[in-house]
């Protein structure tokens, strides 16, 4: 239970137990823990819908279009696993041309930037794919406003206009969601190119559930590979399919796996990455980590930064972050 809680899948397990009708067979303590997690996740899902609607009203008033991303988008789609995610923020995307106006309007409506450090402000505005996170005073969920899904200085540079063109309207609310294949590719990018890997099993579960939901469409797998090739996102898709197969046993059509090999890095790199990703993404209690586990996490952390920024920006960025951590440690001591 502690491992499931650490990896933020306790509510997910509770939902699975409930839908399979085995809840009453569980001992009282774990049953109560699963129920509590489901209730907490459902409450956060309710807050996420409300927070999204507040932002929608502000932007819709001046006809700024908006795409809901990740967790809140899964809620809008009514995906079964969506209400089991422990959300800490909601993510939206607006056109780059409307970004400054959107930020100004949200500030006027009461949202405030949560990070006022001058360097971090510069980092977000010059090199990131989003503005600094916003928070409405007294509310739980932060608001992340994107203009694309990858940093503009990163090695992955998909065309955001293509995402807009393929996006789908959610009823008559004015909110849009990414197409099924773009939703999967965004989740793959977020996990395999845009974050560290400690405690990311939850994100792998997201990908598993997305594929389970969308693959009912006969054209999905072909469209997924084609879209990855078109947007230059084949490498994260390759890693995603490999990790899903190895860690969760997600069924991947043979033809799709074969096509995805065209996105594979050189064989020695692929062998190391596939083995390492399977190890660090597995839901293992930190007390049982093998000796080399922390070293692998560190290498993947450096890799994610290397992919997000060119060397002339990355080196001073990491030096600055290290110095800041050193000062924080000294202050704490």
Residue ranges and their predicted role:
Residues 1-88, 94-333:
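Conserved NTP-donor binding/palm subdomain of two-metal-ion nucleotidyltransferases/polymerases, i.e.
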């Amino acid at each position: 239970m502690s491992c499931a809680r650490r990896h933020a899948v306790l509510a997910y397990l509770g939902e699975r137990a409930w839908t399979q009708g085995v809840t009453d067979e569980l001992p009282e303590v774990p049953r109560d823990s699963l129920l509590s997690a489901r209730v907490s996740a459902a409450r956060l899902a309710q807050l996420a819908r409300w927070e999204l609607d507040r932002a929608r009203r502000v932007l819709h008033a001046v006809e700024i279009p908006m795409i809901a991303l990740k967790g809140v988008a899964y809620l809008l789609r009514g995906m079964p696993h969506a209400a089991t995610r422990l959300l800490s923020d909601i993510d939206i995307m607006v056109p780059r041309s409307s970004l400054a106006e959107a930020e100004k309007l949200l500030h006027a409506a009461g949202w405030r930037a949560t990070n006022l450090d001058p360097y971090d402000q510069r980092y977000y505005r010059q090199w990131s794919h989003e503005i600094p996170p916003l928070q409405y005073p007294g509310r739980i969920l932060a608001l992340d406003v994107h203009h694309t899904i990858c940093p503009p200085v990163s090695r992955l540079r998909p065309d955001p206009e293509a995402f807009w063109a393929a996006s789908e309207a959610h009823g008559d609310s004015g909110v849009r969601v990414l197409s099924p294949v773009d939703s999967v590719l965004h989740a793959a990018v977020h996990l395999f190119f845009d974050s560290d890997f400690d405690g990311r099993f939850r994100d792998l579960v997201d990908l598993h559930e997305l594929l389970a939901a969308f693959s009912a469409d006969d054209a999905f797998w072909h469209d997924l590979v084609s879209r990855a090739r078109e947007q230059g996102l084949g490498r994260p898709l390759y890693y995603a399919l490999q990790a899903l197969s190895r860690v969760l046993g997600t069924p991947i059509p043979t033809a799709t796996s074969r096509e995805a090999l065209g996105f594979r890095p050189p064989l020695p790199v692929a062998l190391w990455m596939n083995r390492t990703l399977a190890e660090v993404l597995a839901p293992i209690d930190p007390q049982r980590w093998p000796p080399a586990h922390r070293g692998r996490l560190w290498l993947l952390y450096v890799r994610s930064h290397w992919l997000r920024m060119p060397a002339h920006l990355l080196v001073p960025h990491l030096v600055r972050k290290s110095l800041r951590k050193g000062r924080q440690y000294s202050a704490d001591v």
